[in-house]
Curated annotation (Swiss-Prot):
InterPro entries: LamB-type_porin_N_dom
Name of the protein this chain belongs to: Sucrose porin
Subunit structure and binding partners: Homotrimer.
Gene Ontology biological process terms in this record: monoatomic ion transport
Family: Belongs to the porin LamB (TC 1.B.3) family.
Length: 41
């Protein structure tokens, strides 16, 4: 159960991470997302 602010933060984080890494390390980004989701549950 996410709040809109949390979703916005995740989207911003993903966007910045994707541009920073130029999609060279998608698995690391996914791992970070999974860790964040576990923390938020």
């Amino acid at each position: 159960m996410y709040r809109k602010s949390t979703l916005a933060m995740l989207i911003a984080l993903l966007t910045s991470a994707a541009s920073a890494h130029a999609q060279t390390d998608i698995s690391t980004i996914e791992a970070r997302l999974n860790a964040l989701e576990k923390r938020l549950q």
